[in-house]
Swiss-Prot record:
Record-level GO cellular component terms: cytoplasm; fibrillar center; nucleoplasm; postsynaptic density
Xref: InterPro entries: CRIB_dom, CRIB_dom_sf, Kinase-like_dom_sf, PAK3-like, PAK_BD, Prot_kinase_dom, Protein_kinase_ATP_BS, STKc_PAK6
Reactions accelerated catalytically: L-seryl-[protein] + ATP = O-phospho-L-seryl-[protein] + ADP + H(+); L-threonyl-[protein] + ATP = O-phospho-L-threonyl-[protein] + ADP + H(+)
Sequence positions that bind ATP: I414, G415, E416, G417, S418, T419, G420, I421, V422, K437
Entry similarity comment: Belongs to the protein kinase superfamily. STE Ser/Thr protein kinase family. STE20 subfamily.
Database matches in Pfam families: PBD (PF00786), Pkinase (PF00069)
Name the UniProt record assigns to this protein: Serine/threonine-protein kinase PAK 6
SMART domains in alphabetical order: PBD (SM00285)
Modification after translation (UniProt): Autophosphorylated. Phosphorylated by MAP2K6/MAPKK6, leading to PAK6 activation.
Cystine connections: none
Predominant location category: cytoplasm
Length: 682
């Protein structure tokens, strides 16, 4: 009667509507897994592919955390305590602070930062080691900019006019700067003032501190008392006032520091020397000073040439962010200040579906003809230091406002590259699938190349170029939302099957259409390979991966950076010679070999060995040349020419007889379907 009832055991039914969609197994003959889910397969394939490389000397150094002074024990600070502590700090290796387009430290500076050279040896002639021999060789006329000041006592500069209204700043810079929020901007200024006050209070009362230690551990000489300006811990010394004014009041000091901080965060140097002032100040050629003019309006095409310029000829810490430094000849690219009014910027590309205005204002760059003039303008100080927050502020001006995490969901990682990862996401409001490229700003080899991901794809739109929808700054990451091409990369296809000549011609014609358009706008892709070619399910071919591209112009007609993927690099890139758009044609020729043979030349060699063979040997040949027609061999020979001047252009190749075999995009659909079938089933 009172016995406890047994609970009924729950009945578990068999699965309903069960479908065995995924079955993963290992093929011992091929030595690989088969039947993996697409996102897993993409990750494995990505890890096997060679990664693009960047010149190691151009890798952006990570900004060091500010050093905290810890006083232990019962030591009582004396009059020389602070100065002695600063001398000890100066011997620490803090020379690797983050700079945009900064040159690697010279051997002299590395020895100084490690304490191998004494202070007296450095103070004997510090200006001798401000530039490396390479920079003096490539820029004999002295390409200098003192964006944040930096003149020794007695050397005056023309002051930068204070912006009185939003109309005073070009390209809508005032509106963009206000979008950052007054609290954020004022907070940065207050931190700068607090650091400045700590530096000034470290000296005994009544005396001026003999030396000020910058962030990079390099001594900066103080000016005389009648010309002394407050030293910003972020942007270096100030620009001297005209008219022989004395020391400014504390209120003027604060406003001046805020102004210089604003300029260091948002102003850059263009490739042109045009001035926007109606009354330009001529540049004296025989006096040891430099003249500067207000910012000018600039097109977004010239912006990229400034933002992603080659860093090989630029000394560390001498330029402000987003400067151009690659030049083919000093006579053509280095110009003195013009005496006339502004020059019109290059108009938007003719083939672009929509026109956008540049969102970064730029200042003018003037080149003194006498190297001693530039040295006097710099005053032996490091002026081009860009902190992580300043770089984020500059990047924030070219991206869209908002938080994409509120608009997207269902993230699935589908790939990984040298700059970040790629995820597949779904838009909440439309249900459309988009590809999201997420790049951590702190983990970039060259963070300034991130501007390419935004500016190039935004301003240059073409039927054969992957469309970019939006770009956002999410915390410490740059998110770029692009169209999702479900056909995958060309690499996936050619690794499984071989293309016939009609299919090869169809791919080449689409890529050449994109290159002809980009080259006409002065854009060099610099990473053409099968991984950068994406396909849609209906067989359309599109060019992607603009993270390593560069822009050339009349003022910067050539580049010199070692950028690209080793097996596809042109000989002139490997040999560090000046190059232009011809390097993309060579890489396309290597990609044609890849479509015929299944892999690029020298793929079994190490990347370094392959680069040596590409640089020193004759142009590579097809392994199976007997399998292709003579017209395809001639098409390939027009691209793989060692002399860039003799190499065919993209427009010339579009008229080649081989492209008469070009078929409709549907001819590539069987290849896409075959690959998807092989990766989804055993």
């Amino acid at each position: 009667m009172f016995r406890k009832k047994k609970k009924k055991r729950p009945e578990i039914s068999a699965p309903q509507n069960f479908q065995h969609r995924v079955h993963t197994s290992f093929d011992p003959k091929e030595g690989k897994f088969v039947g993996l889910p697409p996102q897993w397969q993409n990750i494995l394939d990505t890890l096997r592919r060679p990664k693009p490389v960047v010149d190691p000397s151009r890798i952006t150094r990570v900004q060091l955390q500010p050093m905290k002074t810890v006083v232990r024990g019962s030591s009582v600070p004396t009059e020389g305590y602070i100065s002695g502590l600063l001398n000890d700090i100066q011997k620490l290796s803090v020379i690797s602070s983050n700079t945009l387009r900064g040159r690697s430290p010279t051997s002299r500076r590395r020895a100084q930062s490690l304490g191998l050279l004494g202070d007296d040896q450095w103070a004997a002639d510090p200006d001798m080691y401000l530039q490396s021999p390479q920079s003096e060789h490539t820029d004999p006329h002295g390409l200098y900019l003192s964006c944040n000041g930096g003149t020794p006592a007695g050397h005056r500069q023309v002051p930068w006019p204070e912006p009185q209204s939003p109309q005073a700043l070009p390209n809508g810079m005032a509106a963009k700067a206000q979008s950052l929020g007054p609290a954020e901007f004022q907070g940065a200024s207050q931190r700068c003032l607090q650091q400045l006050g700590a530096c000034l209070q470290s000296s005994p009362p009544g005396t001026s501190p003999p030396m000020a230690t910058g962030r990079r551990g390099v001594k900066v000489a103080k000016h005389s008392s009648e010309e002394a300006r407050p030293q910003s811990c972020l942007v270096g010394s100030a620009i001297g006032r005209p008219g022989g004014e004395g020391s400014p009041s504390p209120k003027n000091q604060e406003s001046s520091l805020k102004h210089r901080l604003f300029r260091s965060m948002f102003l850059s140097t263009p490739a042109t020397g045009a001035a926007s002032s109606s009354k330009p100040v001529p540049l004296p050629q025989n006096k040891p000073n430099s003249a500067f003019r207000p910012p000018q309006k600039d097109s977004s095409s010239n912006l990229v040439a400034k933002a992603q310029s080659l860093p090989s000829e630029q000394p560390m810490g001498t330029f402000s962010p987003l400067t151009t430094s690659d030049t083919s000849s000093p006579q053509k690219s280095l110009r003195t200040a013009p005496a006339a009014g502004p020059l019109p910027g290059r108009s938007s590309p003719a083939g672009s579906p929509r026109t956008r205005h540049a969102q970064i204002s730029t200042s003018n760059l003037y080149l003194p003809q006498d190297p001693t003039v530039a040295k006097g303008a710099l005053g032996g100080e490091d002026t081009g230091i860009v902190t992580h927050e300043q770089f984020k502020a500059a990047l924030r001006m070219v991206v869209d406002q908002g938080d994409p995490r509120l608009l997207l969901d269902s993230y699935v990682k589908i790939g990984e590259g040298s700059t970040g990862i790629v995820c597949l996401a779904r838009e909440k409001h439309s249900g459309r699938q988009v590809a999201v490229k997420m790049m951590d700003l702190r983990k970039q080899q060259r963070r300034e190349l991130l501007f390419n991901e935004v500016v190039i794809m935004r301003d240059y739109q073409h039927l054969n170029v992957v469309e970019m929808y939006k770009s956002y700054l999410v915390g410490e990451e740059l998110w770029v939302l692009m169209e999702f091409l479900q056909g995958g990369a060309l690499t996936d296809i050619i690794s499984q099957v071989r293309l016939n000549e009609e299919q090869i011609a169809t791919v080449c014609e689409a890529v050449l259409q994109a290159l002809a358009y980009l080259h006409a706008q002065g854009v060099i892709h610099r990473d053409i390979k099968s991984d950068s070619i994406l396909l849609t399910l209906d067989g359309r071919v599109k060019l992607s991966d603009f993270g390593f591209c560069a822009q050339i112009s009349k003022d910067v007609p050539k580049r010199k950076s070692l950028v690209g993927t080793p097996y596809w690099m042109a000989p002139e890139v490997i040999s560090r010679s000046l190059y232009a758009t011809e390097v993309d044609i060579w890489s396309l020729g290597i990609m044609v070999i890849e479509m015929v043979d299944g892999e690029p030349p020298y793929f079994s060699d190490s990347p370094v060995q392959a680069m040596k063979r590409l640089r020193d040997s004759a142009p590579p040949k097809l392994k199976n040349s007997y399998k292709v027609s003579p017209v395809l061999r001639d098409f390939l020979d027009r691209m793989l020419v060692r002399e860039p001047q003799e190499r065919a252009t993209a427009q010339e190749l579009l008229d080649h007889p081989f492209l008469l075999q070009t078929g409709l995009p549907e001819c590539l659909v069987p290849l896409i379907q075959l690959y998807r079938k092989q990766t989804s089933t055993c």
